[in-house]
């Protein structure tokens, strides 16, 4: 399985890789759409290419899909806009149907893309019998609780405002995450740059000691994503 996407959708694809490999035991790689077609990728009739785009009109992703189709790959798109160019180029389509993104940044579409990847991984894992006993039913219950959990997070607006007030003066930010939280670190850095115009980087937590630590000082804030430990 190959996943191609740009920007926020690329980060969703990275999470998708973790989910698909973990639950289906199939090899998955993720490529930036803008790089995919320039390296003569190893794609064949046995390759499933999953193209992710909120709008379905991302030029680089469309070009990557056309390159994969030339090589005989089957194309599945994860898209938010019905009837967009990407969906017309695809063999199969998963519509996220998250509604239009009002701001520049992709937010609810990103969340829907993550959910779509987990659902796909669960279904393939169920068919391939690679899931632990009882995992499928428990995972569906957990996913169905997401709207409640998200609403609880949104109620923390005052806490978020207080944290922003304490940290808005920092000149740059470093976001750190490990495993499935690494793409979230990249996404957090992208969102801060996109919306607040503050320089930010996302790194795998274990890589901090291999360079980025040299830039840590009193002018740089560090955000650690450690949701379970």
Where are these regions (language model features)?
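Active-site phosphate/pyrophosphate-binding segments
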Residues: 2, 82, 92-221
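Glycine-rich phosphate-binding loops that contact phosphosugars or nucleotide phosphates
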Residues: 2-145, 225-228
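NAD(P)-dependent dehydrogenase/reductase Rossmann-like domain
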Residues: 219, 228-229
């Amino acid at each position: 399985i190959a996943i191609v996407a740009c920007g926020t959708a690329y980060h969703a694809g990275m999470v998708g890789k973790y989910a698909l490999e973990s639950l289906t035991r199939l090899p998955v790689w993720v490529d930036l759409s803008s790089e995919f077609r320039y390296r003569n990728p190893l794609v064949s009739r046995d390759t499933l290419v999953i193209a992710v785009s909120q709008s379905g009109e991302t030029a680089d992703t469309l070009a990557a899909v056309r390159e994969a189709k030339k090589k005989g790959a089957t194309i599945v798109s994860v898209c938010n806009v019905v009837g967009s160019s990407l969906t017309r180029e695809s063999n199969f389509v998963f519509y996220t149907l998250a509604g239009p993104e009002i701001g520049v940044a992709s937010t609810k579409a990103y969340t829907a893309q993550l959910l779509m990847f987990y659902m796909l991984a669960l279904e393939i894992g169920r068919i391939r019998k690679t899931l632990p006993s009882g995992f499928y039913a428990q995972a569906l219950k957990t996913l169905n609780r997401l709207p409640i959990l998200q609403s609880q997070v949104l109620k923390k607006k005052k806490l978020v405002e207080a944290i922003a007030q304490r940290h808005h003066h920092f000149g740059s930010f470093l976001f750190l995450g490990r495993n499935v939280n690494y793409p979230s670190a990249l996404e957090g850095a992208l969102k801060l740059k996109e919306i607040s115009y503050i320089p930010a980087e996302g790194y795998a937590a274990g890589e901090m000691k291999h360079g980025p630590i040299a830039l840590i000082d009193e002018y740089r804030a560090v955000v650690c994503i450690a949701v379970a430990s």
